[in-house]
Amino acid sequence: AAQKRPSQRSKYLASASTMDHARHGFLPRHRDTGILDSLGRFFGSDRGAPKRGSGKDGHHAARTTHYGSLPQKAQGHRPQDENPVVHFFKNIVTPRTPPPSQGKGRGLSLSRFSWGAEGQKPGFGYGGRASDYKSAHKGLKGHDAQGTLSKIFKLGGRDSRSGSPMARR
């Protein structure tokens, strides 16, 4: 029984990442859609349940630790392609996630809901968070980007997570 359990567990993990890999690997379009779909379902349920979708959380293990998990997942599956891409999206897309995602129906309600839910300006769109609002007006674009990035990772992991793949679509 002891031997069966780890093998079963690794099998489960492998199957999970294999599915991911298949989704990642087929076409770039397919890969993004797969990620988006899983993340969309992820966030949809997350929004509905304040417990942060713990059920799916275990499966993806990417919700709370999404910062480490996203690059890790990428490294495991597509080291050359996904990693820089993820990195790029983290640095570039995250700060300006809300505007592009507002064009997508789901992204709109999603980003507005989650940003607004944290007590910031829901309709602001660009930064949403109060400090981003200030720094954006100060014109510190680069700093704002970094601030938004770390803030998102720290405060609203779900925002950056929803944002980056959203913007990828």
Curated annotation (Swiss-Prot):
Tissue expression notes: Found in both the central and the peripheral nervous system.
Post-translational modification, as annotated: At least 6 charge isomers; C1 (the most cationic and least modified form), C2, C3, C4, C5 and C6 (the least cationic form); are produced as a result of optional post-translational modifications, such as phosphorylation of serine or threonine residues, deamidation of glutamine or asparagine residues, citrullination and methylation of arginine residues. Phosphorylated by TAOK2, VRK2, MAPK11, MAPK12, MAPK14 and MINK1.
Modified residues (Phosphothreonine): T18, T33, T65, T94, T97
Modified sites of kind Symmetric dimethylarginine: R106
Gene Ontology annotations of biological process type: myelination
One of the record's GO cellular component terms: myelin sheath
Modified-residue entries (N6-acetyllysine), positions: K121
Main subcellular location: membrane
Record-listed Phosphotyrosine modification sites: Y12, Y67
Lineage of producing organism: Eukaryota, Metazoa, Chordata, Craniata, Vertebrata
UniProt key word Cell membrane: yes
In-chain residues carrying the UniProt-annotated modification Phosphoserine: S7, S10, S17, S38, S54, S114, S160, S164
Record-given protein name: Myelin basic protein
Keywords: Acetylation, Autoimmune encephalomyelitis, Cell membrane, Citrullination, Membrane, Methylation, Phosphoprotein
